Amino acid sequence: MKNKVLKLKNNKIFDKKLATFLKNLDIFPNNWEFFEKAFIHASYINEHEDVSESYDRLEFLGDALIDFVVAKKLFELYPKYNEGLLTRTKIEIVKGENLNRIGMELKLGDFVKLSNGAELTENTVGDVLEALVGAIYEDMGMKKATEFVEKYIFERTFSEILKYDFFSLFQEQKLPEPRVRVSLTSNNLVLSIIELDGDIIWSQAIPNNKNYDDKSVLEHNAMASFTSFLKSSKGSHFFSDLKEKIENQKMCKKLAIKPKKN
């Protein structure tokens, strides 16, 4: 991917393009220096004496902020996750490959300042995403940085990971794809049901303490609860018992339709 040639931070054309770009991300800077710095690669400094700092420090800050916001979001949204599942899910969201992908999707590379001979890599774009989060925090505070991370990093990634892990559990056991159903009862309970070929194989009813009414969040909670259940001692034999039950049902059907011998 070839990087666009951009001029110094005081260039009005650059400022206008960057302002439009940030506006589309719902970012309206108070201090432009943070955001201009967020796109300056270390190699650029070597060729421009009037530029003294790259995005490295902002990247360091943004990395820590992303890690914290994602951890806090997982902890609050999914109370049924144990420590191991929380950690594994967080790693999938904040890992470099994922941040690189999101940075590329957001087209952050269009604004990166590199030396003339440097190549723009996906890793650099991921670093810039972290630096941008750091810039948002420095200029606009924790609330805005949290909103950005939740919208552009957490929400873009988590549902994909959760669904993949959930359905993979059944694929690994060579079972059909399950169906997840959720509903709210009149006494504010969340009723979660998982079906396989029309049969209910797991269900739970828990208080809706957070007053969620978003169906996708409720479904995510149901998947998380089921996954956590499988990792508990009670769920350790779930699939073996389920498969045995399915085989017994098949056998009963076979016997029921078997013709009588003359």
UniProtKB/Swiss-Prot annotation:
Its EC number is 3.1.26.3. Transmembrane segments: none annotated. The keyword Magnesium applies. GO terms for cellular component: cytosol. Its main location: cytoplasm. Its cofactor is Mg(2+). It is found in: Cytoplasm. Keywords: Cytoplasm, Endonuclease, Hydrolase, Magnesium, Metal-binding, mRNA processing, Nuclease, rRNA processing, tRNA processing. GO terms for molecular function: double-stranded RNA binding; metal ion binding; ribonuclease III activity. It is an enzyme of class 3 (hydrolase). CDD domains: RIBOc (cd00593). GO terms for biological process: mRNA processing; regulation of gene expression; RNA processing; rRNA processing; tRNA processing. Mg(2+) binds at residues 59, 127, 130. The active site is at residues 63, 130. It catalyses: Endonucleolytic cleavage to 5'-phosphomonoester. Residues 18-141 form the RNase III domain. Digests double-stranded RNA. Involved in the processing of primary rRNA transcript to yield the immediate precursors to the large and small rRNAs (23S and 16S). Processes some mRNAs, and tRNAs when they are encoded in the rRNA operon. Processes pre-crRNA and tracrRNA of type II CRISPR loci if present in the organism. Belongs to the ribonuclease III family. Homodimer. This is Ribonuclease 3. The lineage of its organism: Bacteria, Bacillati, Mycoplasmatota, Mycoplasmoidales, Mycoplasmoidaceae.
